[in-house]
UniProtKB/Swiss-Prot annotation:
NAD-binding protein involved in the addition of a carboxymethylaminomethyl (cmnm) group at the wobble position (U34) of certain tRNAs, forming tRNA-cmnm(5)s(2)U34. It comes from Halalkalibacterium halodurans (strain ATCC BAA-125 / DSM 18197 / FERM 7344 / JCM 9153 / C-125). It is found in: Cytoplasm. It comes from the Bacteria. GO terms for biological process: tRNA methylation; tRNA wobble uridine modification. This is tRNA uridine 5-carboxymethylaminomethyl modification enzyme MnmG. Pfam families: GIDA, GIDA_C_1st, SAM_GIDA_C.
Amino acid sequence: MSYQGGEFDVIVVGAGHAGVEAGLAAARMGANTLMLTLNLDAVAFMPCNPSVGGPAKGIVVREIDALGGEMARNIDKTHIQMRMLNTGKGPAVRALRAQADKFLYQHEMKKTIEEEENLLLRQGMVERLIIEDGECRGVITNTGAEYRAKAVVVTTGTYLRGKIIIGDLAYESGPNNMQPSINLSYHLQELGFEMVRFKTGTPPRVNGETIDYDKTEIQPGDEVPRAFSYETTKYITDQLPCWLTYTGDKTHQIINDNLGRSPMYSGMIEGTGPRYCPSIEDKIVRFNDKPRHQIFLEPEGRHTSEVYVQGLSTSLPEDVQLDVLKSIPGLEKARMMRPGYAIEYDAIVPTQLWPTLETKKVPGLFTAGQINGTSGYEEAAGQGIMAGINAALRVQGKDGLILDRSEAYIGVLIDDLVTKGTNEPYRLLTSRAEYRLLLRHDNADLRLTEKGYEIGLIARERYERFCEKKAQIAAEKKRLESITVKPSKEVNALLEEVGSAPLKEAVQANVFLKRPEVTYEHVAKVIPAPEQELSADVAEQVEIQIKYEGYISKMLQQVERAKKMNDKKIPEDLDYDAINGLATEAKQKLSEVRPLSVGQASRVSGVNPSDISILLVYLEQGRLAKLGKKTV
């Protein structure tokens, strides 16, 4: 028996990392929002690694914060350790990574949601969508509750027809033995969505009290205070270490001897797994020439003995997992608390989405996170905030927000998904971004805070601080151009100390700073101080912008050329079959993806430069024909 559960502007289905960002974004933009989740105790749950950030992913977390999202602030309050990665490399690949207290992370995120004014959090299993006049108008739960809305965001993670597999044991389940969502997956197929079956996995957890840490290498956090959020002012200083150990010949022998019992090789697992996060049995087979593989031991929180055995993701039978653990230095006597497992789940083919993450088949329906074929909390959260923003903008009758590939890693992620699709769980990598020098950890606010303010996610007070920071950067760059550094004894002594060639003639301070060995801190020692003391963030930004000015300038020229192609819009209803000369494959792929611009069309798999030339001629002929009609 059904009943009317209420009317909302936006409904978010799921409260994982995509769902919480979607719900908070929509609510903070003024939309009356309902968030439905299978289990109130699993809000922002971390079923796999207890960490946030890393290469590319850490920059996404910064971007979420710059737009006005929550992940960065939450991990800053709940981490047990932070490290800046790739500090010996250029700024384009530097990224922050935090070990989370996964239980505190959940608690704090749930508290934030419960306290949000326009957001109602409720437990319930959504089984069907309400479709009226071809549009999504709400959801129906298994208890018969009908909730109506102007937009719905589905963020179901790995719960859609979830199946856990350990050895020859397989059963319907969401992650960590939670209830799966079965009927919603079938309903999406009924609506005509093309689905795929993906797989991911997780390693065993062991009791930290039973680890022999003397046989491992300690991995401490950075002593320098770190934070993801631009708003964080209080830093956690009592960090917990992680530890490093390795597999060995014995480990590899045990796994090789039991490959016949592995679901990966017995045919039990049908779903495609993540290329960049392989199981330990996959690593042993694919990289059989490697004598050992890294294993990181990561505490799951401050008030638990559970330790995550990172690098040992597996679906081998439980008895084999125990033998594998005993073969690893430091884990000989470790007690397993939870076995590793593989989980299969359904996802939609993401080329069925517009770049706003609204589905093409059903207007008013948005999807975000692992349902779109991605892996990782950060990728999910990045999609979540964009889906929430665009759902709220739809309710407001406004155009959606689409981030360009040159503006954000989130833009790269979404463009890759909706334009190219994915045949495996998609992981964001720095190599996927052609403009990665522009998409740095340090400048996410300069790229996106303006947009966050315009849509109503950034408060005026924060925006004013941001504007002041921009002004300070510009003023200091200009000041350095006006100051001359002369080849004095003091200057050349400094240069000798840092291993740089002596200065032979006077140069501008900004030119002096361009020397590879010279930092802003060095420059500050040999020139007058600015009227106002600069923050470390401003000084870092000044240094990077000056040092990489030439490279950045070249990349901006590339962006401008690409923009010309992106500015050439394509009608949504364009009949590609009517374009003479277009290759058959191009017609099929373009009809499926329905790119919104020539730039996007050029990135569709199977579309060649010759196809783009023909498309450009066709669009130009259409434009001229329209002009001719207007002048008649």
